[in-house]
Structures are given as structure tokens and as C-alpha cells.
Amino acid sequence: MSLYLKAEKIQSWRVLIMACAGFIFNTTEFVPVAMLSDIAQSFDMQTADTGLMMTVYAWTVLIMSLPAMLATGNMERKSLLIKLFIIFIVGHILLVIAWNFWILLLARMCIALAHSVFWSITASLVMRISPKHKKTQALGMLAIGTALATILGLPIGRIVGQLVGWRVTFGIIAVLALSIMFLIIRLLPNLPSKNAGSIASLPLLAKRPLLLWLYVTTAIVISAHFTAYTYIEPFMIDVGHLDPNFATAVLLVFGFSGIAASLLFNRLYRFAPTKFIVVSMSLLMFSLLLLLFSTEAIIAMFSLVFIWGIGISCIGLSLQMRVLKLAPDATDVATAIYSGIFNAGIGAGALFGNLATTYLGLNEIGYTGAALGLIGFIIFITTHLKYRHTFLLQNNKKITAL
């Protein structure tokens, strides 16, 4: 094997490790969705109230993403990753022993702190450590890792939770995180901070209208998705009258749709980025609008959830790629803001879902999400039409507004 091929193989393994890290972080963020009923029962709470643990997690990421990124902006990236995993593991140990819901929320906030920095640096890191001609594929690999969190993480987490308790699920995640941390120590090179940006980058980013409106669109569209997705488990059981095993299968289908979305993104996004986003948003709205009707037949729900998963996964990938394109001079800061806003959308969606469930009924979460999705869709189309011919100047380079 030539030195070039050997180096490329090592780089590919490094990307795979980061994809596994993404899998772990996404699994722990969303696995409560599959165990809300069990967690609520443990603390003698209403399921809708337990869903607020998603809100607290997401809003911790929102609040901490930018300040934490600025505080760690000059740190060598490998050592930073190791520190993040230590915080992540300690948070999960606290989750396992949580003796009341408030301790559980404290543990989730600890994990969210690690999350806020991890997702601020991961996309740009993956592109740095990947083979030169496989940058887009590397981002796609990271996306597959996050998609596997819903394919394997959520269903397996639910199964483990049902068999031996939700605490064991979080304990297993801690063990997996420890294994990945050792792989990072062993295989990742030292990675000095590069194009991370600083507090001085904020005024420059604030002068890029396409980027600012992209953040607004992200917050609203992600809120639309999580308005329904946060409560999909009780929706399927209480409204759809599905057996809990079928509910697990639906989550599995949602996860597989993420892999399909990653493949579509790798093949199609570069040819027509804006059309790709528009179609993806349309799929999301269509799915949420028809969510209640899909409960009439099992096959309808499986089909709709698959389409829904493709839509939201493509949205997440394409919006993140656009952020990187619009802020190549401050990738980590711009991504930190994106990550914070993305999680604000998760928290707001969980809250909207809670309000819809409480005041309108669980069967209305799809309509509520679709209404929010329409608002985000209109904002995206309007701002694209207004700014599609603009150019952003940074470091004497023209950055085409895609």
C-alpha cells in the first residue's frame, strides 16, 4: 500500500471516529423521546411535563454555544475533545444515579454544555481531517452517524429502557463515550485552532443578511419539527393506538430515512442547493400536516414518517453546509451560533408541543408543527429572492450567496 493510500485510510478512520462521536451525542440528546413515558413514571410525573427535559437541554446549548466557543476558541482541538468527553461521561454518571427530576435536569445541563462546544467544532474538524477530495462525503459520513442515532440509538435505547430501565440506557451511552474518547486519544492528531473566529467576528457576521435570515429560518423550521417529534411516542400510542413495539419500529423507520437523506444530500445538493432546501421543507410541512391522518393505517404512518425523516434530515444537512459557505472565515463561531439556534428550535418545539398537547390535545401537534413550518418556508423563500444576487465581502474574497 502506498504512503498516500495509507494516509488516506487513516484519515477515513478519523472521520469515522468523529461520526461515532456524533452518534453518541445525538443519541443522548434525543433518546429521552423514546423513553418519556418510563421517565415520567419513575418520577411520578405527567409525560408532557417530562418532555421539558428536552427543552432544558436545548436551551442550555442555546445559551452556552457562543460563549463556550469563544472561551475555547484558541484551544488545541484534540485536547478540547477529550475534555468535552470527560464532561459528557460525568453527566451520564449523574443521570444514572439521579434521585429526583431536578438532579436529572442538572445532569442534562452538564451534558448539554459538552454538546454546545462539540457541535460547534465538529463539522469544520471533520472537513479538516478528511481526505482532500472527500470533504462533502466526510460531512455526509458525519450525517450518517447522527442518523444512526435514530436508527439504532433511539430504538435500542427504548428496548433497553423497557427491559431493564432507562438508567441503564444512559449508563451504556457513558461506556460507549469512554471507548470513543480512547480512540480519539489514540488516533486523532493534534489539531490547532484554525479559522475558528473570535468575538471580533460577530460584527462581520452580523453584516451578512443571508446568514442572519438563515439563522431565523433554522430556528422556526426546527421548532416546527420538534413540536411534533418530541411527543411522537405518546402520539403513536395514545392517538394512533399503536402497540409500543410498533412505536419502536416507527422510530426505526425514521432513523433509516436519515441515511437515505444523507445519500440524497451527497448526490443532489451541490447541483441545486436552494431547490434542495425548498423541496426538503415542503416534505416536512406535508408530513406534519398529514400526521393525524396517517394514524388510520399502519402503512400510512410508516410511509409518512419515512418522508418526514428525509425532509428534516436534508434540511439539517443543507442549512449547516450553507452556514459554512457563508462564513468560511469564522466557521466555528458561525457554527456555534447555528448550533445554539438549532437547539433553541428544539427547545421551542418541545415547549410548543407541550402547549399544544396541554391546551389543544395531543392529536393537534402535527397541525401546530405544520403552521410553524409554513412560516419558516415563507421566510426562506422571501429572503432568498431578496438577496440571491448579493455578494458578501470578507478578506477581499467574494462569497457568492447561494
Curated annotation (Swiss-Prot):
This is Probable sugar efflux transporter. Gene3D superfamilies: MFS general substrate transporter like domains (1.20.1250.20). One of its GO terms (molecular function) is carbohydrate transmembrane transporter activity. Pfam families: MFS_1. PROSITE patterns: MFS. Involved in the efflux of sugars. The physiological role may be the reduction of the intracellular concentration of toxic sugars or sugar metabolites. One of its GO terms (cellular component) is plasma membrane. Keywords: Cell inner membrane, Cell membrane, Membrane, Sugar transport, Transmembrane, Transmembrane helix, Transport. CDD domains: MFS_NepI_like. It is found in: Cell inner membrane. InterPro entries: MFS (IPR011701), MFS_dom (IPR020846), MFS_Efflux_Transporters (IPR050189), MFS_trans_sf (IPR036259), Sugar_effux_transptr_put (IPR023495). It is a multi-pass membrane protein. It comes from the Bacteria. Belongs to the major facilitator superfamily. SotB (TC 2.A.1.2) family. The chain crosses the membrane at residues 15-35, 51-71, 84-104, 109-129, 137-157, 168-188, 209-229, 245-265, 276-296, 297-317, 333-353, 365-385.
